[in-house]
């Protein structure tokens, strides 16, 4: 290949790369789901949220199926302005009271909806949300609607096993041209 042909080919590659970079500059939020049977979903989500806080972003956290015990993530992030809303009933398999679990979930969900509507929040972490949908504590349609109506720039992180496919369908993907 001649130097001239090589230079022309590389120029075309550069134009494609530049176009992709320009497209990626669109400031829009995404939905990230950490799901599956293994460990580390909440840890990965908090790592992402911590990084966002480190870059000056405003983050809100809603924890479903968590207890009242102190945790390191909250101890670290609350002093940096991260709002936490925690269901604080403990694990639902311990309480075994569907009515009170559903009521507690609905109460915390109201805070989650407020955060999802708040354009000042760059990121909202919905820890263990998948269980709330799977256990029918929250209507799937209401969750999908709140996710769809969130501010354009807001990123949402969802954790938990068995994420419903209708939530997974909201994930933004961009196939390569």
What is the role of each PLM region?
Residues 1-29:
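Extreme N-terminal, non-catalytic leader segments
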Residues 14-17, 105-110, 156-159:
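Short gly/ser/thr-rich secondary-structure transition/capping motifs
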Residues 33-39, 43-113:
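Conserved P-loop
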Residues 80, 169-170:
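Short, structured coil segments at secondary-structure junctions
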Residues 97-148:
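Phosphate-binding/switch loop-helix module in NTP-utilizing enzymes
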Residues 120-122, 152-157:
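Loop/turn-to-beta-strand initiation segments
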Residues 160-164:
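Short, polar loop motifs at secondary-structure junctions
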Residues 172-177:
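Conserved small/polar residues in nucleotide/adenosyl-binding loops
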């Amino acid at each position: 290949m001649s130097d001239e042909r090589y230079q022309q080919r590389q120029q075309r590659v550069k134009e494609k790369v530049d176009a992709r970079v320009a497209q990626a500059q669109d400031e829009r939020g995404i939905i990230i789901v950490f799901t599956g049977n293994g460990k580390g979903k909440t840890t990965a989500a908090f790592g992402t949220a911590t990084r966002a806080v480190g870059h000056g972003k405003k983050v809100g956290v809603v924890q479903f199926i968590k207890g009242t015990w102190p945790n390191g993530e909250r101890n670290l992030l609350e002093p940096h302005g991260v709002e936490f809303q925690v269901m604080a009933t403990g694990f639902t398999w311990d309480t075994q009271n569907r009515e009170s679990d559903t009521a507690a979930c609905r109460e915390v969900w109201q805070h989650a909806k407020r955060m999802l509507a708040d354009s000042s929040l760059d990121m909202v972490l919905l820890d263990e949300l998948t269980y709330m949908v799977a256990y029918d504590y929250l209507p799937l349609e209401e969750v999908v609607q709140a996710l769809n109506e969130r501010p354009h720039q807001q990123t949402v992180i969802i954790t938990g096993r068995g994420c419903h496919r209708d939530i997974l369908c909201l994930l933004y993907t961009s196939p390569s041209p």
